[in-house]
């Protein structure tokens, strides 16, 4: 367990010093939010503004799938880690680093959303809960996409484009939650996550385990 915490700490440092994931997500999310407010009417903002911003956030997060293993693969640290800790812990560390960074980025922009979109505190809580569920699934899929690209090394950049369709059900649920403040839909999102998360972790672990043919 201690080794997992050490790996998560290392990944948080790597992803935010090298890839600047928190800074990038906050800036991109703010840009999408402010652009939405400036170019749309108040009615359209209330209907579609937040959903559009969430979609943009997920697109920006998917972009990290090609780099999450890049530095580890280039400097040989991935091979070293595989000889020291289990491949499952490496995948979990990647997942938690991306998920924690994404959550921090989301928390930073919540006050801006509260002001610009004129939402109540309850609506902000529903919004955070639903997007948080999406971030759980998207973080695992980003790791899976990164694992595929790391394993094949070439001509695998297209893999990231397959992530977005898997997130569509949760995006639809988020829209319904924001429209009706229906807490029960969050439990459906949890169920969707419970279906995809084990599959994503299993496939990612298998790919990383066999990348150097290490057993």
From Swiss-Prot:
This is Uncharacterized protein RC0356. Keywords: Cell membrane, Membrane, Transmembrane, Transmembrane helix. GO terms for biological process: cytochrome complex assembly. The keyword Oxidoreductase does not apply. InterPro entries: Cyt_c_biogenesis_CcmB. Pfam families: CcmB. It is found in: Cell membrane. It comes from the Bacteria. Its main location: membrane. The chain crosses the membrane at residues 21-40, 50-69, 95-117, 122-144, 156-178, 183-205. Belongs to the CcmB/CycW/HelB family. It is a multi-pass membrane protein. The keyword Transmembrane helix applies. GO terms for molecular function: heme transmembrane transporter activity. GO terms for cellular component: plasma membrane.
